[in-house]
Amino acid sequence: MRPVSKYGQNFLIDLNLVELIARSAEIGPSDIVLEIGTGVGSLTSIMASQAGAILTVEIDQNLFQLASEELAPFPHVKMIQGDALKNKSTFRDDIMESIREAKSRLPDDSKFMLVANLPYNVATPIVSNLLHQDPPPDRIVVTIQKELGERMVAGPGSKDYGALSIWIQATCRAEIVRILPPTVFWPRPKVDSAIVRLDVDHERGNAIPDLKYFHQTVRALFFHRRKFLRSVVISAMKGRLDKPAIDEILGRLGHGETARAEELNLEQISDLVEALRQAELANE
């Protein structure tokens, strides 16, 4: 078996760390787990003894067949062969439909989790987009590049602070569980990795009137993160809000001419995005 580089495959070969991922997720007997990147089924097998239902997705046909044999004893594990994403911003319909179906037949207090050693090349779209799916996850425990994990937990003024930091922290409590060196993977990646746990705070998420608008607008605001905030907002709102309306919003929120998006904290960004949304609605 050879890793396929286009799939971003780096297999975690330290069983103690595989067990740490499962343990960090605190999976209960009525919980539903989504795993992206089945691999040979090592993590899946551990979780199968803990979860009420598992949906595991593997893009590599050879690995899918190998894992199918490994997971055959577990009838509550459903496998899907193919790409988890329909495009960069959307999960495949059958994946979320399978999650909804599993949730409908398990107790009301069951949790939905993403637990996975994620392929590096899809980690950001997988985590970012899962947070505004139906149903949204309750917890995410994933192995990703260390740099990506640091971006998720970064604060204002940090070099790692950006759209991903805002999006994750607007909906989750985030922590880095463990930093992993390249030596615990095969083949060895060129960078360190991290096990990251995100506990989704549904109250925080529900306080955002339009999650999709929030996500898209935050990404636009940080596209040129070091530019002055006014020019960034004008660019992001082009054809949607005129300059006087934008200047009124920035003035009302107390953002001066030299303000930059990378200096604003989560509350300030949230207030700005909501003010822009309300102004757009008033324009309709």
Swiss-Prot record:
InterPro entries: KsgA/Erm, rRNA_Ade_diMease-like_C, rRNA_Ade_Mease_Trfase_CS, rRNA_Ade_methylase_Trfase_N, rRNA_adenine_dimethylase, SAM-dependent_MTases_sf. It is an enzyme of class 2 (transferase). GO terms for cellular component: cytosol. GO terms for molecular function: 16S rRNA (adenine(1518)-N(6)/adenine(1519)-N(6))-dimethyltransferase activity; RNA binding; rRNA (adenine-N6,N6-)-dimethyltransferase activity. Its EC number is 2.1.1.182. It catalyses: adenosine(1518)/adenosine(1519) in 16S rRNA + 4 S-adenosyl-L-methionine = N(6)-dimethyladenosine(1518)/N(6)-dimethyladenosine(1519) in 16S rRNA + 4 S-adenosyl-L-homocysteine + 4 H(+). It is found in: Cytoplasm. S-adenosyl-L-methionine binds at residues 10, 12, 37, 58, 83, 117. Keywords: Cytoplasm, Methyltransferase, RNA-binding, rRNA processing, S-adenosyl-L-methionine, Transferase. Disulfide bonds: none annotated. GO terms for biological process: rRNA methylation. Its main location: cytoplasm. Pfam families: RrnaAD. It comes from the Bacteria. Specifically dimethylates two adjacent adenosines (A1518 and A1519) in the loop of a conserved hairpin near the 3'-end of 16S rRNA in the 30S particle. May play a critical role in biogenesis of 30S subunits. NCBIfam families: ksgA (TIGR00755). Belongs to the class I-like SAM-binding methyltransferase superfamily. rRNA adenine N(6)-methyltransferase family. RsmA subfamily. This is Ribosomal RNA small subunit methyltransferase A. It comes from Rhodopirellula baltica (strain DSM 10527 / NCIMB 13988 / SH1). The gene is rsmA.
